[in-house]
Amino acid sequence: MPDRSEVFDIVDATDCVVGEASRSLVHDQNLLHRAVHVFIQTRSGYWILQRRSAKKDLEPMLWTSSCSGHVDKGEGYLESAIRECKEELGLELVRSEIEEVFRCSQCSETGNEFVRVYQARALGKVTPCPEEIIETIELRLDEMEVELAREPQRYASSFRHLFPFLKKKLSLT
């Protein structure tokens, strides 16, 4: 179960920090805050998705990006992305190994989170944390699109919202 006493920065409509609040207060009062999503590509070119643990307080057991999480109080987006890769997948990344793909303003689909989406390559062994992740799967981008269209209810709302932007950005590279 997530620690409801975690503290996050509260931000305004322009993503500037204006205060801080506990996780429970942020979610109970729908306050604007920050999050990251990281999409990890394997050496063979597949993208890793994770199925969220049943212990998650929001959207348990749904498929989402390789790893994701809130930006903690005083933490930057990039630092948060690197931390989440370590905590959820056991991947130790350095700044030069992770790249920002796009930014998403807060909306209901992201749970009032300003989101930065990153990509990285899994150069080491992926070891999912059982407290965070039930299972992982490796798919090509086109396979993700087919699966998402076929059974959207199996995917977290933030993933459903972010995927079209991700697909567009990655198709341009």
Where are these regions (language model features)?
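Nudix hydrolase/Nudix homology domain
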Residues: S22-S24, M61, K73, E100-F102, ...
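A short, polar/proline- and glycine-enriched secondary-structure boundary/capping micro-motif
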Residues: Q29-L31, L58-W63, L139-R140
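Acidic, metal-coordinating catalytic segment for phosphate/diphosphate chemistry
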Residues: P2-H37, R43
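A glycine-rich, hydrophobic loop/mini-helix early in the fold
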Residues: A35-C67
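The catalytic Nudix box helix
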Residues: I48-L49, S66-E99
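Short helix-to-loop capping/linker segments positioned immediately adjacent to catalytic or ligand/cofactor-binding
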Residues: D15, L89, C104-S108
